[in-house]
Curated annotation (Swiss-Prot):
Membrane topology: Peripheral membrane protein
Organism (species): Chloranthus spicatus (Chulantree)
Swiss-Prot/TrEMBL keywords: Chloroplast, Membrane, Photosynthesis, Plastid, Repeat, Thylakoid, TPR repeat
Protein name, as recorded: Photosystem I assembly protein Ycf3
Name of the gene this protein is made from: ycf3
HAMAP family, sorted: Ycf3 (MF_00439)
PROSITE patterns: TPR (PS50005), TPR_REGION (PS50293)
Similarity comment text for this entry: Belongs to the Ycf3 family.
Keyword set includes Repressor: no
Role description: Essential for the assembly of the photosystem I (PSI) complex. May act as a chaperone-like factor to guide the assembly of the PSI subunits.
Stored InterPro entries: PSI_Ycf3_assembly, TPR-like_helical_dom_sf, TPR_rpt, Ycf3/AcsC/BcsC/TPR_MFPF
A GO cellular-component term linked to this record: chloroplast thylakoid membrane
Pfam families given in the database record: TPR_1
Length: 168
């Protein structure tokens, strides 16, 4: 049974109903419709915390989806799951892949910055200031890109850039 039929959340049900209506009325190929169905089911599983099921759906959606913009969001969500699972190297890979297809995803730049900042903090705890500085510099670059795309957002990152004298 498709996940959209078993989810009890009101918002998810509403989204599923609207998505099903749109799938019927918007002229798209069967492959595009199938890709969207997997993407929708992946989002539903992800919101329930069922990451293994979400990944299966997202991987199938990436296999079917041909539009680069739509693929960027699928890849971004895969990155989110890997981030949640502590698989930061994989997460960075998927955020990069998402940005290759859609360079206007400030949330991907932000998440990459958070991972780099975290790795910098780990390096400080391990006493490796050179590596910490490199990770922090990389975090700064990603945060600058996120802020450039959405100037009113990422206030904490903006403040960190100022405090660490990395903001130009």
């Amino acid at each position: 049974m498709p996940r959209s039929r078993i989810n009890g959340n009101f918002i998810d049900k509403t989204f599923s109903i609207v998505a099903n209506i749109l799938l019927r009325i918007i002229p798209t190929t069967s492959g595009e419709k199938e890709a969207f169905t997997y993407y929708r089911d992946g989002m539903s599983a992800q919101s329930d915390g069922n990451y293994a099921e979400a990944l299966q759906n997202y991987y199938e959606a990436t296999r079917l989806e041909i539009d680069p913009y739509d693929r960027s969001y699928i890849l971004y969500n895969i990155g989110l799951i890997h981030t949640s699972n502590g698989e930061h190297t994989k997460a960075l890979e998927y955020y990069f892949r998402a940005l290759e297809r859609n360079p206007f995803l400030p949330q991907a730049f932000n998440n990459m910055a958070v991972i780099c900042h975290y790795r910098g903090e780990q390096a400080i705890r391990q006493g490796d200031s050179e590596i910490a500085e490199a990770w922090s510099d990389q975090a700064a670059e990603y945060w600058k890109q996120a802020i450039a795309l959405t100037p009113g957002n990422y206030i904490e990152a903006h403040n960190w850039l100022k405090i660490t004298r990395r903001f130009e």
